[in-house]
Amino acid sequence: MIDISKAPAPLFDDPEWHGATDPFVIWHPGRKLWFMYYTQRRATLPNPNGVSWVHGSKIGIATSPDGINWTFAATAKGDHDLTNPLAAQGAGPEPGITWWAPGFVFENNLIHMYVTRVDGVYTNWTGKRNIVHFTSEDGLTFKYVSTAQLSSERVIDASVYKIAGTWYMVYKDEAAGSRTTRSESKDMDTWTNARQVSPDGSQEAPLVFRWKNAWWLIVDAVSNRGLRMYKSENGIDGWQYISTVLTDRNGTRPKDNNVGHHPGIVVQGEGEKEQCLVYYFTHQGNQTVIQLAEIEMGTDGKPICNRNKYAPTTRPAGN
């Protein structure tokens, strides 16, 4: 069990670029460690052109024995330009390509990563964006499997889950008004039946999970509108909006006085002891850090999140 009451704030600060975003936390049973994967933005890049500092990013990896004390481990290694995106042949005005927003699932003794690939290093928000599937045994070195054929070539922020033998991927389709979109697969590689999940404005970072005997969808409502939560009976369709969390800027913890972005969820415990932990990032200018809070069920049946509930106890790992 992750003891959130002992979590530092910030939880993690990338020691190389101070631009950790898009956290995804998963337990590796073979390594007996928690792995945190994140986009390693180049937040301290000197004199960047436009938003080039958000491009050219690698996938950072931190590990933890307890889910609260994190140590920077490495950046993800692998073929298909995963190791060194800046050395790749890109289509943008600056050298290289970009990796963003990894999502993970553990299946058949392998970690499966679905990560956004941008085909260049751009100074604006252009370029082709696809979801790429990699696998890994150790969680550090990955092998390319396939590039998903989805609803457009402007898709980002994939997460994958399984219901009754079918895999579902939710993602942001920027070519469809940045709506949350869902595709399905029987083999984790051939994706079909793309359809819109929610019509509620621009969204990114969709993630589906089980909590309180129900299916939940959490999204980052852009721009700076907090984390919207939806509920479904079957986890596939019929999503109903319930509430929004981490919308305010009244966090009292260090570097937590801003809207929460791009959630990663860990649900632990059972029954009355079940907890929904949310890993998210906050901005301080270009620089970002990862924070940890708890989503709880309010008395009215709507999720709430008091980020100030637990006081920080130690300095963040990675500093």
Predicted feature locations:
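Carbohydrate-active catalytic/glycan-binding domains of CAZyme proteins
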Residues: M1-N319
